[in-house]
């Protein structure tokens, strides 16, 4: 049960926004007893917004880091291609599994740099969801990608041996759709090598940590799952990705 409100914020202006529930909604919440109410603010991509003050009738408790999954990936994980933030696979995943996700995706810059990996490893997280390869394939070969992924998995499994790591094989999903629809991909040969490296390293570290590789071929298969650029998922694609990840996480009790 959730309510959605939209507010327009002018650039360079300080705005005061009031969020208020209808009387019927308040009565419903009171009927639930002491169950907590979660307020989630979704900001537009590529926009900087600062909170100066939050005034509430009741005390607001911030979620602890260890209650959240950390999501790291490309613009796909940031929600590009979805109609709005609430339609992105990250948000759908939260709703499907009733979990909190801290989105650390970097549009065009998910390159697994050691400094970024070190930062992610320092976060006190419940688990990690990783969507890797889309950005890296454009600026490095599979050997360098494997080197960086090896460092990442080694660090996470060493520092967080009991922390689940879910890897979304998004390149496999894209290549599967291209193949079924006779689309020539400029990264076809490179994708095969990257996918092979991901599978190899998952197998290597699966004996040490709790790593779950989600097959891209089971996420989305039809062309309407992609947007017009044939790279970012469409709204339907985001829904399918969230559904595929949800099934795996439910199967292994990761939520």
Language model: regions and residue ranges:
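N-terminal secretory targeting modules
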Residues: 1-69, 246-255
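Serine-esterase "nucleophile elbow" of acetyl-processing enzymes
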Residues: 39-107, 114-124
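A general structural detector for well-ordered alpha-helical segments in enzyme core domains, enriched
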Residues: 89, 145-152, 194-201
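Oxyanion-hole/transition-state-stabilizing segment in secreted/luminal serine hydrolases
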Residues: 93, 110-155, 170-178
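The substrate-binding groove and active-site-proximal loops of carbohydrate-active enzymes
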Residues: 133-145, 182-191, 228-232, 236
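A short helix->loop->beta-strand "cap" motif at the edges of active sites that frequently abuts
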Residues: 160-165
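Substrate-gating cap/lid alpha-helix
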Residues: 173-215, 240
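Histidine-centered active-site loop/cap adjacent to the catalytic His
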Residues: 228-255
């Amino acid at each position: 049960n959730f309510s959605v409100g939209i507010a327009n914020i002018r650039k360079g202006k300080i705005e005061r926004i009031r969020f208020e529930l209808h009387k019927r909604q308040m009565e419903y919440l009171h009927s639930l007893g002491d169950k907590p109410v979660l307020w989630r603010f979704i900001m537009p991509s590529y926009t900087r917004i600062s909170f100066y003050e939050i005034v509430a009738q009741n005390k607001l408790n911030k979620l602890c880091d260890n209650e959240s999954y950390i999501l790291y990936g490309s613009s796909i994980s940031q929600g590009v291609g979805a109609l709005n933030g609430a339609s992105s696979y990250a948000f759908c995943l939260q709703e499907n599994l009733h979990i909190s996700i801290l989105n650390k995706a970097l549009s065009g810059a998910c390159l697994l740099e050691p400094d970024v990996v070190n930062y992610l490893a320092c976060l006190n997280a419940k688990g990690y969801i990783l969507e890797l390869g889309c950005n890296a394939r454009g600026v490095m070969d599979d050997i360098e990608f494997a080197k960086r992924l090896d460092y990442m998995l080694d660090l996470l499994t060493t520092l967080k041996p009991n922390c689940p790591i879910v890897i979304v094989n998004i390149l496999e999903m894209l290549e599967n759709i291209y193949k079924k629809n006779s689309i020539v991909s400029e990264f076809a040969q490179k994708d095969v090598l990257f996918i092979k490296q991901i599978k190899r390293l998952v197998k290597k570290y699966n004996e040490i940590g709790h790593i779950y590789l989600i097959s891209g071929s089971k996420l989305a298969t039809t062309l309407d799952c992609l947007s017009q650029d044939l790279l970012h998922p469409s709204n339907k694609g985001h829904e399918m990705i969230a559904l595929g990840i949800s099934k795996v996480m439910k199967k292994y009790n990761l939520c």
